[in-house]
Amino acid sequence: MYKKILVALENGRADETLLPHISHLARLLGSELLLIHVADGWAARNFEQLGLAESEEMIGDRDYLESTAGTLRTGGLHVDVCLARGNPPDEILKTAEQYHCDLIAMTTHGHRLFGDLIHGSTITSVRHKSRIPILLVRAGVPSTPPS
């Protein structure tokens, strides 16, 4: 169970809450991790159609993924990375299926109706469409996984 976990990262502080939980779970279960970040800016969304080069933001996102993966690998975990481009919910679900992940891990920000209308909700879309279990960790809540 949970041989490959897709970990959706935001390249932000919320990841600091998620990663300790997921790395602990991966060690307990012997799971592989697939870190994904979905670049969704203009350049990312039009990358293929216009033959664009990676934007500064996309280069920074790739560096962040590789750095985070390196830290987790140093801790003894098997980690791959994926920088996707486009609509975050669609790319998360497509990548999870493509790589045969059996768990998706994400952070939730605890928005309510108004916040979701302004910010959108990747989680809402993913949880309604996913056929794979989802583990949600509340961002910004200081916690440590059990030892």
List the model feature ranges, each with a label:
Residues 1-49:
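Small/aliphatic-rich secondary-structure junction motif
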Residues 1-17, 128-147:
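Intrinsically disordered or low-complexity boundary/linker segments at protein termini
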Residues 28, 37-63, 143-147:
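Acidic, proline/glycine-rich short linear motifs
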Residues 36, 80-84, 135:
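General small-molecule cofactor/ligand-binding pocket signal
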Residues 37-38, 107-109, 138-139:
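Short secondary-structure boundary segments
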Residues 50-54, 98-100, 122-124:
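Short, hinge-like loop/turn segments at secondary-structure boundaries
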Residues 70-104, 141-147:
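Structural beta-alpha unit
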Residues 106-129, 143-146:
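Glycine-rich, Arg-bearing micro-motifs that act as flexible, cationic patches
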